[in-house]
Amino acid sequence: MFNMINLLDLSLEDLKKWMIENKEKEFRAKQVLDWVYKGVYNFEAMKNIPKVITNKLQENFYLSVPSVVQKYVSKDESTVKFLFKYNDGNIIESVVMKYKHGNTICVSTQVGCKMGCTFCASTIGGIVRSLSHGEILGQVLKAQEETGERISNIVMMGSGEPLDNYDNSLNFIRMVNAENGLNIGQRHITLSTCGIVPKIRQLAEENLQITLAISLHAPNDNIRRKTMPIASVYSVEELIEACNYYINKTNRRITFEYALVSNLNDKEVHAEELATLLKGMLCHVNLIPVNKIDEKDFKSSSTNRIKNFSNILLKSGIQTTIRREMGSDINAACGQLRRRYVKNNSKEV
């Protein structure tokens, strides 16, 4: 298998080229991928594909759709959390959230994470490896198979930093957006980053209409550096400049994620400072009650303080929402289930 290629890493054009190089008709490429997107991962089960082609496919490709290690469904059935295992034994998490407007999946782009944000369980233990775009796609396909429902929205907010896995993240976006793929509109895809400034500027040149979400979590450098190592590399000023560049290039509104930690970044003065920082920007602030992590000592802000923080931003003309908690009874916050599983089971490869 080590010399074989994950078929999910091939675009339609890639597979067409392979068919031609192997003396087969290029239309067979679409037929094969149609089966894959219908959830058929066994080449021999692709009924309209001749045996001679399925034999060649089996000799050259494998389909890396992860297996389900654990599956948790919240009491209200609005959230389904998966622990997926890849062929090399590595574990990642994906979460499906069901809304009235459709089903959203939160995908992981790396096994673990090296960014070191102190309120995130994904980064405990560091990074193991990045996922290929086909492996990220496999999360969506497997989730659809398990839930029996179509995924209509994607958020790249699971474990890992998407911009630290730049090429695979972009290839994944283009594959799920393709008409011959899942045909999910770019405006239904959100990429979240801790703020790698050069990559934000690079992303601005890609001619994409996705939503960019920035994990900001502080109105100034002093506070941000206490929780996010990336803040020692790029200042808040540099980050905001890159965001304005992105907005001007794409004409797309940016979302700023702000996890509220009691007595760290949740006071009125912090809200006022944040309002000043974001004044005039085409942006939206998503306030997040911080999740409890076993290994960390952070405490979420009180409901009253969160509402007060939100009101200050709203009165300053900043579009603001408070994230609805989903799946808290199944530890659906990023990285928590994987961390617990890895801790209690055999070492990852």
From Swiss-Prot:
Active-site annotation: E93, C334
GO MF assignments: 4 iron, 4 sulfur cluster binding; metal ion binding; rRNA (adenine(2503)-C2-)-methyltransferase activity; rRNA binding; tRNA (adenine(37)-C2)-methyltransferase activity; tRNA binding
Function of the molecule: Specifically methylates position 2 of adenine 2503 in 23S rRNA and position 2 of adenine 37 in tRNAs.
Pfam families registered for this protein in UniProt: Radical_SAM (PF04055), RlmN_N (PF21016)
Binding site residues for [4Fe-4S] cluster: C113, C117, C120
Co-factor note (free text): Binds 1 [4Fe-4S] cluster. The cluster is coordinated with 3 cysteines and an exchangeable S-adenosyl-L-methionine.
Gene3D superfamilies: 1.10.150.530, Aldolase class I (3.20.20.70)
EC number, as in UniProt: 2.1.1.192
GO cellular component: cytoplasm
Keywords: 4Fe-4S, Cytoplasm, Disulfide bond, Iron, Iron-sulfur, Metal-binding, Methyltransferase, rRNA processing, S-adenosyl-L-methionine, Transferase, tRNA processing
Binding-site residues, S-adenosyl-L-methionine: G160, E161, S192, S215, L216, H217, N291
Superkingdom of the source species: Bacteria
Cellular compartment(s): Cytoplasm
Organism field: Clostridium tetani (strain Massachusetts / E88)
Name of the featured protein: Probable dual-specificity RNA methyltransferase RlmN
Catalytic activity: adenosine(2503) in 23S rRNA + 2 reduced [2Fe-2S]-[ferredoxin] + 2 S-adenosyl-L-methionine = 2-methyladenosine(2503) in 23S rRNA + 5'-deoxyadenosine + L-methionine + 2 oxidized [2Fe-2S]-[ferredoxin] + S-adenosyl-L-homocysteine; adenosine(37) in tRNA + 2 reduced [2Fe-2S]-[ferredoxin] + 2 S-adenosyl-L-methionine = 2-methyladenosine(37) in tRNA + 5'-deoxyadenosine + L-methionine + 2 oxidized [2Fe-2S]-[ferredoxin] + S-adenosyl-L-homocysteine
